[in-house]
Amino acid sequence: MTRASLNKQPHEVASMFDHVAERYDLTNAVLSLGQDRAWRKAVARAVDARPAQKVLDLAAGTATSSLPFARTGAYVVPCDFSQGMLQVGKERHSWLPFTAGDATRLPFKDDVFDAVTISFGLRNVQDTDAALREMYRVTRPGGRVVICEFSHPTWAPFRTVYTEYLMRALPPVARAVSSNPDAYVYLAESIRAWPDQPALAGRLGRAGWSRVAWRNLTGGVVTLHRGFKAS
């Protein structure tokens, strides 16, 4: 089986996602207890894509996260660095312009997109700050970023229960439904090591984003961070 280490070497992370691509969406639905749909809807509302706007969906995987933007009439570009995920996505949604790309070295010109979004992917990037700067670079002045990521529950008793779920319950569930359960051990470990809500907001600000704010979902299990590029 394949899993990445917490130093997040790009080739390790890409290989890990190559191995889970076929059953990735199903596994996410099971492990999130069905909450993934509600989280995607919250992302779509926060991005607020409009007809003819250009939206970059980073770490888009199979493009499940891209579809809500396409339905608004926006031009959405699903971008990922896992060839396995891109291949599955192309088989399912051949009409979308799938693009291979590393979040720290995006293959796009400056000031192109009205919105850039990344769901459950920033945590897997080796250099978070470089990725935030690249998102800023490719966003047009006045545009926005929306980041959806696992975070830290705000209520201490629930935080304890959630940590137990990550470390004890999640691995056996993953073994039952995933093609690469070891990847979900990495998932649990990377969530625990991820910065909390204020810390990530600070990093967005240092990357250039203004009016940074966040909203907790499911008690802080997931958090939406949003920022804007000054006009």
Swiss-Prot record:
Keyword Methyltransferase among record annotations: yes
Please give the biological process terms from Gene Ontology that the record holds.
menaquinone biosynthetic process; methylation
- Key word Glycoprotein present in the record? no
The record's catalysed reaction(s) read: a 2-demethylmenaquinol + S-adenosyl-L-methionine = a menaquinol + S-adenosyl-L-homocysteine + H(+)
Which Pfam families did the record assign?
Ubie_methyltran
Residues that hold S-adenosyl-L-methionine according to the record: 62, 80, 102-103, 119
The GO molecular function terms of this record are: demethylmenaquinone methyltransferase activity; methyltransferase activity
Which keywords fit this entry according to its UniProt record? Menaquinone biosynthesis, Methyltransferase, S-adenosyl-L-methionine, Transferase
Provide the E.C. number(s) assigned to this enzyme.
2.1.1.163
Which InterPro entries does this one have? Answer: SAM-dependent_MTases_sf, UbiE/COQ5_MeTrFase, UbiE/COQ5_MeTrFase_CS
Q: In which pathway does it act?
A: Quinol/quinone metabolism; menaquinone biosynthesis; menaquinol from 1,4-dihydroxy-2-naphthoate: step 2/2
Q: Which family is annotated? A: Belongs to the class I-like SAM-binding methyltransferase superfamily. MenG/UbiE family.
Instruction: Provide the function of this protein.
Output: Methyltransferase required for the conversion of demethylmenaquinol (DMKH2) to menaquinol (MKH2).
Question: What is the official name of this protein in its record?
Answer: Demethylmenaquinone methyltransferase
According to its UniProt entry, this protein's organism is Streptomyces coelicolor (strain ATCC BAA-471 / A3(2) / M145)
Q: Taxonomic classification, please? A: Bacteria, Bacillati, Actinomycetota, Actinomycetes, Kitasatosporales
Which gene name belongs to this protein?
Answer: menG
